[in-house]
Swiss-Prot record:
It comes from Homo sapiens. One of its GO terms (molecular function) is ubiquitin binding. One of its GO terms (biological process) is protein modification process. This is Ubiquitin/ISG15-conjugating enzyme E2 L6. Interacts with RNF19A, RNF19B and RNF144B. Interacts with FLT3 (tyrosine phosphorylated). ISGylated. The active site is at C86 (glycyl thioester intermediate).
């Protein structure tokens, strides 16, 4: 009950004043603990398209962190092939119940725009970004153009 009340309030707040990097924020009709959103990164190579997200809140929220998953494929060292994200702010050891979803989404936007090669989920992409940044950016741009979602106007 507490989780849904807080989640509803956070959703309403974000819908009233959405950050510039987020669009189409909504919850599942049947479950307010599941949100969908469109992330619009502003840095190359990800700025060319947008990416669908699914945000799932556990019943224990805010005492347990939400889970965020990319449902659009993304070529990124901190996102695995299944869309799972390595985002320190929502890790069990770092999570604080006072953290709001808007802060989590801001951290995600920063991470997408500036990959963290110290905590990769895809070591191959972290290595490529370190050893050959131009090739990484070229591959990421091609992947983004192929799999990304058109950005809303």
């Amino acid at each position: 009950m507490m989780a849904s009340m807080r989640v509803v309030k956070e959703l309403e707040d974000l819908q009233k004043k959405p950050p510039p990097y987020l669009r189409n924020l909504s919850s599942d009709d049947a479950n307010v603990l599941v949100w969908h959103a469109l992330l619009l990164p502003d840095q190359p190579p990800y700025h060319l398209k947008a990416f669908n997200l699914r945000i799932s809140f556990p019943p224990e929220y805010p005492f347990k962190p939400p889970m965020i998953k990319f449902t659009t494929k993304i070529y990124h060292p901190n996102v695995d092939e299944n869309g799972q994200i390595c985002l320190p702010i929502i890790s069990s050891e770092n999570w604080k119940p006072c953290t709001k979803t808007c802060q989590v989404l801001e951290a995600l936007n920063v991470l997408v725009n500036r990959p963290n090669i110290r905590e990769p989920l895809r070591m191959d992409l972290a290595d490529l970004l370190t050893q050959n940044p131009e090739l990484f950016r070229k591959n990421a741009e091609e992947f983004t153009l192929r799999f990304g979602v058109d950005r809303p106007s």
